[in-house]
Amino acid sequence: MAAKTISFPKGKGHLTHNNREFICNNVVPERTSWNRIYIQEPLKDAYEKCFGQALRDYNATQKRKDRQKEDYLKEIENSGNKEKTFYENIVQIGKKEDTSVVDEDGNLTEDAKTAIEILEQYAKTFQERNPNLYLFNCVMHLDEATPHLHIYYIPIAHGYKNGMETRNSLTKAFQQMGFAKAVSRKQNETVAWQERERKYLTELCRERGIDIEVLGIQRDNLSLPEYKAVMREVEELEQ
């Protein structure tokens, strides 16, 4: 069996595409019912769960009403420093050439079945493995060329002495999960986390007899060609 690849690119965070609120050209509508939804929590509800108490605690210490915060989610959305309200990664085992969802007769391939098992185990263990990344949306798509996961998460960092005690911070969330502080652009918390997640996926693959081709960490910072094409279409539809 030829070695397969693990793809773990960053996504652009198009929840409407992920939740199939509209159908792009690369989607096979007849297979959309095959998709597996693990969690779909509204972003606003997730923010209340993650930061609601911290927001109320902060406001309780402010005697002046003009210093109180009304909506932490909107505060991040409206900040001028390009803060992200959430992050997305796409997780894929193989490519359409070696892990196609269906065969010529439209039946689920054996390679796809194995990939689904791996991706499902990854999805179901993500939160336990990443306690400071709150998973609020996770879906496996089987209505495109290759099985893949979309994972959406909110980074949670604790222990701030000024302002809200708990906040959205990807760097600090990684640090509080034990990843060392960055020493360069190529040696930082995000890269270390990506490496760990890819190692876990590699272990899951090898347990099922799949060899993995190592392509290097920089591949994780690139979008899959199929995904890039979909995102261009999504952006056009949302304009």
Q: Which role fits each region the language model picked out?
A:
Residues 1-239:
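N-terminal nicking endonuclease/strand-transfer module with a His-rich metal-binding environment
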